[in-house]
Amino acid sequence: MSETTSILIKDTTILSDKIKKASILIVDNTIEEISNDLSVTDASKVIDGTNKITMPGLVNTHSHVAMTLLRGVGDDEELQTWLNDYIWPKEAKLDEKLVYAGSKLAMAEMIKTGTTTFNDMYFYMEETAKAVEESGIRGVLGYGMIDLFDDEKRKQEIKATKNLIKNSHNTANGRVQVAVAPHAPYTCSKELLSESKKLANKHNLKLHIHVSETQQEVNDLEKQRNQTPFEYLDSIDLLDENTIAAHGVWTTDNEMKLLKEKQVSISHNPSSNMKLASGIAPVSKYIKNDINVAIGTDGVSSNNNLDMFSEMKLTALLQKVNTMNAKTLPAQATFNMATENGARALGINTGSIKEGKLADIVLVNMNVPHMIPVRNPLSNIIYSALGSDVDTVICDGQLLLEDKKLLTINEEDAIYDAKLAAQQL
């Protein structure tokens, strides 16, 4: 990894809560100064920011990164068939080496498309932590616990999470954080859910869970418990400001009140929800109710990539057509979802370009045909940009990508290893 301790991004268009032209000085892992008076002698490394939009690194709040190995598996199936007949049988063959290879490939893809932080739930997470440490990205990692209402399995799952906390939490200079990650109300017993929250509270960790992804899930729980998923989770004290609920597609007005009151964050996954025909999450309604909504890609096999630029555009367009109102979810609100809202959900001091924030920064090339003319840089980022327009990525003050070249990952090796790993599944 680069030894650079100071970086100057010179004369660039900065996109954060407002648009301005200035230079940015990074010292160690922090944005030290934003000014027009900075000189090339102020830093040991200077990056030319002209013809670039400089923006916060994107925050992917729901992923299963090692599922890169399952790209193209189970296409065109609805969720339960997709899980039961395609995904879970292949996941049963996973081991440490395969998860590491899949994670490394995902890091390469995420860095090259401007993601600097991701919130992940999967298996063999120590291997993903290792890939995070090596690649320089930032990850919140949870072991996906599923007990299928079996007592012995519950004990094993809690033990696995405790081991992950012990081995990986707050490692890699703080870039690896651990979350407690019970999979979903329909795969986890009440006891596992309760123990998960106690564990999260004890260690002051985030709790990451799938909730109300499909109508079937909601209907089944209502039949069993006479409660909707969020009502059920609230009844066992699972909801608070440290809860990140992935999907939240089928949410009632009463649940909206609960989510606002408990300050729960929602991770919206538009590509996945569309591909699996799960439904359209009521994002504009969440925002009207002052609920923090961020964006996630979900796993590659229900997307089928990790490009957060695609997710931003889909998020905006889907809400506009769903409400039949073109003014719904304007570009700034969408941008905030993929940056500062995600950072808020994860409790990380990033998501905007301001002095004192962590230096997680992406430079996007404006000088390409589909970005010209640049009348409004914000509009271009949401509606025109592609992940492949990312030119430079800095995370925690370290250069991870420069001139589109990965600096911390050998891309050829990552691709080769992932191809071999995928063959074993």
UniProtKB/Swiss-Prot annotation:
Its cofactor is Zn(2+). One of its GO terms (molecular function) is S-adenosylhomocysteine deaminase activity. Substrate binds at residues 91, 183, 213, 298. Gene3D superfamilies: Metal-dependent hydrolases (3.20.20.140), Urease, subunit C, domain 1 (2.30.40.10). It is an enzyme of class 3 (hydrolase). CDD domains: ATZ_TRZ_like (cd01298). Binds 1 zinc ion per subunit. Zn(2+) binds at residues 62, 64, 210, 298. Its EC number is 3.5.4.41, 3.5.4.31, 3.5.4.4, 3.5.4.28. It catalyses: 5'-deoxyadenosine + H2O + H(+) = 5'-deoxyinosine + NH4(+); S-adenosyl-L-homocysteine + H2O + H(+) = S-inosyl-L-homocysteine + NH4(+); S-methyl-5'-thioadenosine + H2O + H(+) = S-methyl-5'-thioinosine + NH4(+); adenosine + H2O + H(+) = inosine + NH4(+). It comes from the Archaea. Catalyzes the deamination of three SAM-derived enzymatic products, namely 5'-deoxyadenosine, S-adenosyl-L-homocysteine, and 5'-methylthioadenosine, to produce the inosine analogs. Can also deaminate adenosine. The preferred substrate for this enzyme is 5'-deoxyadenosine, but all these substrates are efficiently deaminated. Likely functions in a S-adenosyl-L-methionine (SAM) recycling pathway from S-adenosyl-L-homocysteine (SAH) produced from SAM-dependent methylation reactions. Belongs to the metallo-dependent hydrolases superfamily. MTA/SAH deaminase family. Homotetramer. SAH is a product of SAM methyltransferases and is known to be a feedback inhibitor of these enzymes. As a result of this inhibition, organisms have evolved efficient enzymes to metabolize SAH via different pathways. The pathway found in methanogens differs from the canonical pathway, it uses the deamination of S-adenosyl-L-homocysteine to form S-inosyl-L-homocysteine for the regeneration of SAM from S-adenosyl-L-homocysteine. 5'-deoxyadenosine is a radical SAM enzyme reaction product which strongly inhibits radical SAM enzymes. This is 5'-deoxyadenosine deaminase. It comes from Methanosphaera stadtmanae (strain ATCC 43021 / DSM 3091 / JCM 11832 / MCB-3).
